[in-house]
Design a protein with these regions (language model features):
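A structural boundary/capping signal
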Residues: 1-142
Length: 142
C-alpha cells in the first residue's frame, strides 16, 4: 500500500534536472527540485493512488505564465507534491479535472518515463526492505 507520506520523500529524491519540464529548465535548481516536476509527478501519483488530475493556471501580476498539475485523491482531498516550487509572486488559480492520457503523456514523455522508473524502483526497494525486516527471505522459493 502506497500512501502520500511514504511517497513524498521518494518523489523528492527522484526529481532531477533530467525529469524537469523543458519549459522550466531555466528556473530549475537543486535547491528547488520541485520546479517543473508537476505534470510528470501528478501522472505518477494518479497511477499509484488513483483519483483525478487537476490543472490550474500559474499567474504573475494577473497574467498567465504557465500551468500547474496536482492530484485529487479518491476521497476528494487535493494533494500537491510540487506546490513548493513557486516563487512568492506566482499564484496558482483555477483547477479543472483533466483526462488521464492513456499510455502516458505525449509531452515530456522521456521525463515521465525516467521519473516513473525511479519511483517504482524506490517503492520496490522499500517493499523488499520491509519484507526482510519482517523476516521474509527475498527471492527464494518456499
Amino acid at each position: 500500500m502506497t500512501d502520500t507520506e511514504m511517497l513524498r520523500p521518494i518523489l523528492r529524491g527522484a526529481w532531477g534536472r533530467d525529469t524537469c519540464d523543458p519549459h522550466d529548465l531555466p528556473d530549475w535548481t537543486p535547491e528547488n527540485p520541485a520546479r517543473g516536476q508537476c505534470g510528470v509527478t501528478a501522472l505518477i501519483v494518479q497511477e499509484l493512488l488513483g483519483g483525478d488530475l487537476v490543472l490550474g493556471e500559474v499567474l504573475v501580476g494577473g497574467g498567465r505564465v504557465g500551468y500547474h498539475y496536482w492530484n485529487r485523491l479518491p476521497g476528494g482531498r487535493d494533494i500537491d507534491f510540487t506546490a513548493d516550487q513557486f516563487r512568492p509572486d506566482e499564484v496558482v488559480t483555477g483547477g479543472t479535472i483533466q483526462a488521464v492520457p492513456v499510455g502516458g503523456p505525449r509531452r515530456c514523455r522521456e521525463q515521465w518515463e525516467l521519473l516513473r522508473g525511479r519511483v517504482l524502483t524506490a517503492l520496490d526497494d522499500q517493499e523488499r526492505s520491509r519484507s526482510v525486516a519482517d523476516g521474509e527471505t527475498p527471492n527464494r522459493a518456499r
